[in-house]
Each structure stands twice: as C-alpha cells, then as structure tokens.
C-alpha cells in the first residue's frame, strides 16, 4: 500500500489540520498555493538544489561508525551526518526552501521561533543570504542556555527577541512568533522550524527535510546492497526524524524508531515525552499529541536539550504511531549525556545533545540485533553549542 498523507485538509488521520484565526487563513492558503506551484516549477527546484549542494554542502556522508558498532556489539551503525551541513544541523535544509518560497511570494521579511538556537541561526543565515529582514523569537530561558547562538544570530543581522511569557521556552517563542506574523502578515513569511503548525507547514517541512532520508536510502543501498533493518532519530517537534523516516515509509521491512526526551524520567514531571505521556489537543494551529494537565492546560516540557523541550509533536508522528508504522521510545538526560561522551570517545564526533538521545537508543537497539543487520541513525547536529552546558554539568557532578 502506498502511503498518502496528508489529505486535502491537511489531516494525517485525526491529527494535523488547520486551526488558525481568520487573520492567518489567507496567508496559510497563499503559502499552500505557492508551495504546490513550486513543486512543479523546474526553475525553483533547480535553484533549491543549487543552494543545497553549493551552500549547505549536500549530500552529507553516511558514515559507518565502526568503533561505536564494536562497542554496541551487534548491528552495523551508520550515522547520517547532518552535523556536517553549513550551520551544523539539519535545520538549514528547511530554511533554504522556505526562504526561496518567501521570495517567490514577494515577502522580504521572515520571522521564526527557536529553542536550541539552531533553527534561529539557520533562518538568520538564509535571511542574510537572500537579503531579508529577520526577527527571531526565543524563550528567555533558552536565551540564557544558548547565549552563543544568540550572538551568532545577531552577527548574521537578525533581531533576537527574548520572550518572557509563560515558561520562557520554545512553546512561548512559537506563540509570540505567531502573534508577530498575524500583525505583519502582508510582507512577512513565518519560517516554521519543525513539522508542526497549521497545514501546510508540517508537509512543507517534511518535504524539505526528506532530503535526509532520500540520500540515506540511496547511500545505504550502495554500501550494503540492501535497505537498513532500522532507522533511528531523535524527536522534539520531529523534523529530522520525519526527514529520515518519510522516504522509507513504504519500505515495510525498515523499522522506524523515534526517540523522545525523558528528561529526569517519565515518572517525574520533568520530561518532554509527548508520544508516551501526551493526549490529543490543539497546539499552535494543529491537532496533535500534547503534554497537558487534567484541565487541558499545556504542561511545561523539560529536557537537558533545548531543541527537544516542546510539549507537542508533529501530527504525522502521532499518525505513524497509530498506524504502527513507527515506534517511539524515550531517553533520559543522564543517558543522553552518556551517549554524548561515548560518541566523542569512540568516533571523535561531538554530537548535539538532541542527537545524543538517538545515539543512546541506537546503541541499545544495535546490541539486540545481529551483526549482519544494519541501522541508520540521524546525527541531526553537532554539539559545539552544548559543550559549555555539559562542562558545567560534569564539573557540578565532580564537585558534589
């Protein structure tokens, strides 16, 4: 059966859709039309591919992690090296595409939200490249955690707005960015950073990130002569995971594993495991699994990794879970930090804390598989941004 989603109303089963105020409906429909037109526009696709190759540096390698594989003692572990993209993460695959779309629609200003700062940096980068005015909303807590990325965005010419409302994290930054878009919708495009938000955003972001899985599928076939038995990626909103998963969706022999942030543990209040612990609700314009209390109030998500502490999850991930097409697991802060150090020492690669969640689960999974089997893990970003935070954490542990 060939997988086809979303439907014409933007639903993935019961998830997704378009729940936006009237003021945004026109902009969302305009975006939908521009996006559909761009898919069959040869000049647009040629330009997109040009920038992905010459500017982002694609395709990224599919690297056989020999020492990590030996450590796990099971299946071969291949790393899809999204950390080697310009700006150091998968985020730029999407921002390049959306900036070109914005230009196509005649919009000279862009706005975005950011958690870890990676999407903010990737948005500020393409805004500089295409000479656009750029405003980034970031929760005050994240501004503190990721001060280096804030400075990077400012260097690139973006205006960074620190959001002091609510939990002062990603969810609140999205709220403020959406408000800003409503007020400036005529000349501004909202570059959504993940497979979230009202239709067509989840579909657009999925399609621009699918380059990850398309390349990985081809590369793995070249290296192993077969498809991998499993693919693994971390999930916050879920764009790097969807980018890896989507091109494999009709390959039923390939198991798909998403890894959420369990923070201090699923039994505590301090986690961001939306699929494990969430319930269906509407957040930021779409129906999705959401962390909420018994009164339907959105709970604060928590993770050591700023890029994973979102209280919702892309609607298509919830749909994959319901279909039984993908499985979702969770990894604690401590396990992610352990995997971070493990990859540094075994492969000489410093991964992002987000990606470390995927590495942690991948090592567990590989150890239960046979040596003639293999898996692809999305190394969604590099860890430069996290080194300081980790230094403080590990020094704190030594001093205790």
Curated annotation (Swiss-Prot):
Molecular-function annotations in GO: tryptophan synthase activity
Reaction equations catalysed: (1S,2R)-1-C-(indol-3-yl)glycerol 3-phosphate + L-serine = D-glyceraldehyde 3-phosphate + L-tryptophan + H2O
E.C. designation(s): 4.2.1.20
PROSITE patterns: TRP_SYNTHASE_BETA
Cellular component annotations (GO), alphabetically ordered: cytoplasm
Residues that bear N6-(pyridoxal phosphate)lysine: 91
Known cofactor(s): pyridoxal 5'-phosphate
Gene3D superfamilies given in the database record: 3.40.50.1100
Pathway in which this enzyme or protein is active: Amino-acid biosynthesis; L-tryptophan biosynthesis; L-tryptophan from chorismate: step 5/5
InterPro entries per UniProt: Trp_synth_b_CS, Trp_synth_beta, Trp_synth_beta/beta-like, TrpB-like_PALP, TrpB-like_PALP_sf
The organism's place on the tree of life at top rank: Bacteria
Protein's UniProt keywords contain Metal-binding: no
Alphabetically ordered keywords of this record: Amino-acid biosynthesis, Aromatic amino acid biosynthesis, Lyase, Pyridoxal phosphate, Tryptophan biosynthesis
UniProt-listed NCBIfam families: trpB
Function, in words: The beta subunit is responsible for the synthesis of L-tryptophan from indole and L-serine.
Family, as annotated: Belongs to the TrpB family.
Subunit structure: Tetramer of two alpha and two beta chains.
Alphabetical list of PANTHER family matching this protein: TRYPTOPHAN SYNTHASE, TRYPTOPHAN SYNTHASE-RELATED
Record protein name field: Tryptophan synthase beta chain
Taxonomic source organism: Listeria innocua serovar 6a (strain ATCC BAA-680 / CLIP 11262)
Gene from which this protein is expressed: trpB
């Amino acid at each position: 059966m060939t997988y086809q989603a979303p439907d014409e109303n933007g639903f993935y089963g019961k998830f997704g859709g378009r729940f936006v105020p009237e003021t945004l409906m026109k902009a969302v429909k305009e975006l939908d039309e521009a996006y559909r037109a761009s898919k069959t526009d040869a000049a647009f696709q040629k330009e997109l591919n040009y920038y992905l190759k010459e500017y982002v540096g694609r395709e990224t390698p599919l690297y056989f992690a020999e020492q990590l594989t030996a450590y796990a003692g099971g299946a071969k572990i291949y790393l899809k090296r999204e950390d080697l993209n310009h700006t150091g993460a998968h985020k730029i695959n999407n921002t390049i595409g959306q900036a070109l779309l914005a230009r196509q629609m005649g919009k000279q200003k862009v706005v975005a939200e950011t958690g870890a700062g990676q999407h903010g940096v990737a948005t500020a980068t393409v805004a500089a490249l295409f000479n656009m005015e750029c405003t980034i909303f970031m929760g005050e807590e994240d501004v503190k955690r990721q001060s280096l990325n804030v400075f990077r965005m400012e260097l690139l010419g973006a205006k960074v707005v620190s959001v002091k409302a609510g939990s002062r994290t990603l969810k609140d930054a999205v709220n403020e960015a959406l408000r800003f878009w409503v007020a400036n919708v005529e000349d501004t495009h909202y570059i959504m950073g993940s497979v979230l938000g009202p239709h067509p955003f989840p579909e657009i972001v999925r399609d621009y990130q699918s380059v990850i899985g398309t390349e990985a599928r081809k590369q793995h076939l070249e290296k192993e002569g077969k498809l991998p038995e499993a693919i693994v990626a971390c999930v916050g909103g879920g764009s790097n995971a969807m980018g890896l998963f989507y091109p494999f969706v009709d390959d039923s022999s390939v198991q798909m594993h998403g890894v959420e942030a369990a923070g201090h543990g699923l039994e505590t209040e301090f986690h961001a495991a939306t699929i494990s612990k969430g319930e269906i609700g509407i957040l930021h314009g779409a129906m999705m699994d959401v962390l909420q209390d018994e009164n339907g109030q959105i709970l604060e998500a928590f993770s050591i990794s700023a890029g994973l502490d979102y209280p919702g999850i892309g609607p298509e991930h919830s749909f994959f879970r319901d279909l039984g097409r993908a499985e979702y697991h969770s990894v604690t802060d401590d396990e992610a930090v352990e995997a971070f150090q493990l990859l540094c020492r075994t492969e000489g690669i410093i991964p992002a804390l987000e990606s470390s969640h995927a590495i942690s689960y991948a090592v567990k999974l590989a150890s239960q598989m046979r040596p003639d089997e293999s898996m692809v893990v999305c190394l969604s970003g590099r860890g430069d941004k996290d080194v300081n935070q980790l230094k403080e954490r590990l020094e704190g542990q030594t001093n205790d």
